[in-house]
Amino acid sequence: MTKNLLVELGLEELPAYVVTPSEKQLGEKMAAFLKGKRLSFEAIQTFSTPRRLAVRVTGLSDKQSDLTEDFKGPAKKIALDSDGNFTKAAQGFVRGKGLTVEDIEFREIKGEEYVYVTKEEIGQAVEAIVPGIVDVLKSLTFPVSMHWAGNSFEYIRPVHTLTVLLDEQEFDLDFLDIKGSRVSRGHRFLGKETKIQSALSYEEDLRKQFVIADPCEREQMIVDQIKEIEAKHDVRIEIDADLLNEVLNLVEYPTAFMGSFDAKYLEVPEEVLVTSMKEHQRYFVVRDQDGKLLPNFISVRNGNAERLKNVIKGNEKVLVARLEDGEFFWREDQKLVISDLVEKLNNVTFHEKIGSLREHMIRTGQITVLLAEKADLSVDETVDLARAAAIYKFDLLTGMVGEFDELQGIMGEKYTLLAGETPAVAAAIREHYMPTSAEGELPESKVGAVLAIADKLDTILSFFSVGLIPSGSNDPYALRRATQGVVRILDAFGWHIAMDELIDSLYALKFDSLTYENKAEVMDFIKARVDKMMGSTPKDIKEAVLAGSNFVVADMLEAASALVEVSKEEDFKPSVESLSRAFNLAEKAEGVATVDSALFENDQEKALAEAVETLVLSGPASQQLKQLFALSPVIDAFFENTMVMAEDQAVRQNRLAILSQLTKKAAKFACFNQINTK
């Protein structure tokens, strides 16, 4: 016989960004708890609103499965003394299992007998296990937590109710300072307290109190309501996925509506209007069928349609205040002079240990000079890059960015165009912030890409130089994201810029404001980001590529992919083993690896030396790998017919020199002795 279990935790309003992860975490931990308690079930469904987290388990077995476990103890020679009596070792072993020496039996394993005991545990009724659910609730983790009412414990928000039902049976469990009951809370304004009748009636009991407990249902309600407004007004409404997820976690009973604002505000840049609506007011943007922004917005109310006109007016009033600010800053910022703002950046701190933003820009400008040549920019692109690097942070001192910091770079582009700068300079100022997330959009222009790399590199090197190095999950200055951005941009543009050589060049630069330090740590940090970009590539292949001598990001990623692609082929294992043996022996070479053909003693070493001399890795990574694997028979023949570590020192070093030259070329692809072929 199966049962249905419901657990609901009623809290004060949760931050929207916490709701969905917490709901998922509750479901996962409940499933793990039940499996750990040997309770089978058919399905788990989770629920969440801003004021509750809940989980329902259906088809839950009414008792634990019985458990039979065998435990291996000490060897028989240790378990018995010379008189055949059980020793203290044997007695202690069985006592620890809650058994006696009478339960001991001996089993033979690989010719030797050992103590074994079998312990049987009869499964308990599910009712006896339910109280342990409190530990599941206590185990939930949150990005922030708080104390309340003088209590010593912490939780994401104060807890008001706990409901635990097994079908209709109520459990009055104690959790924090709350005693469980079947009472739950309805909508804050439209509903009231209600009793949940059973685990299966949960959604309907709450629906009567204007609470839609299932977030998927709330999401669909919002989407359907927006689609209805679209059809009614013949408009297009942008349903941004992130905004939708946030809004559904702000409401328990959603009602979407359309509001409007004066069309005069459409003269302000669209990005300002969209930011005001989406980021600050959580409104959806409305466009006509041609994609043109309209003076309307969509909001979602936490409630029904009663007095909706008053709600619309209130939302319009709040938005207009934001738009007034945007219009004012747009008008006033155009009176500013870019060069004056750049000069004022001398008084804006980048970081107290590093210096001003202006000093950061100067260092970035010097880095762009190095990168421009390596990225093979044209003369015009180089000129645009120099101009962009000289002014690219100026918009941080505009009123608009001061009010709407999400628009940094975006407003820089617009103001530079108004000031007569070239489109390339303007675009680079916008693009230098890219990417803004792990999977964020990358710069499209070469000028913007180089400026983005230079800005991020100085940021990384500057913070490392003053000892502000990320550790563990702690990365307050987003240096991992900056490094990931550098790596992604280099890969996307296919620039064959060796990172080790570039970093060496940067450390050779001289600045009045700062001296770069901790180069080794920087290199390890960059390699860790390349490692991350390799994704699910096997660890040994990652290590082989990262240990290689080629630190061109695009080449490294391509090499890793090529190795993974051929790793299941028949010749992979023997080819890698041949190269690996060469790598291991080459480490014994001394001095400069010079090969003297006069010291050859057989045709096989001559053949390998000639093959290595003519080896030039070229083309895509898959082709280079074929070139290396083609040497496998020649390498094998060399090892089969040649004693590398010959007694004659000159002959030995000559043979090691052949292998050293081979591995030097192969290491541009990967260090093959790092690959596991077992």
Swiss-Prot record:
Query: What GO cellular-component annotations does this UniProt entry give?
Result: cytosol
> In its keyword annotation, does this UniProt entry include ATP-binding?
yes
- GO MF annotation terms: arginine-tRNA ligase activity; ATP binding; glycine-tRNA ligase activity
Give a yes or no for keyword Protein biosynthesis in this entry: yes
Give the highest taxon in the source lineage.
Answer: Bacteria
- Its GO biological process terms? arginyl-tRNA aminoacylation; glycyl-tRNA aminoacylation
Catalytic reaction annotation: tRNA(Gly) + glycine + ATP = glycyl-tRNA(Gly) + AMP + diphosphate
- Family of this protein: Belongs to the class-II aminoacyl-tRNA synthetase family.
Record's subunit section: Tetramer of two alpha and two beta subunits.
Q: What is this protein called?
A: Glycine--tRNA ligase beta subunit
Q: Which organism is it from?
A: Streptococcus pneumoniae (strain 70585)
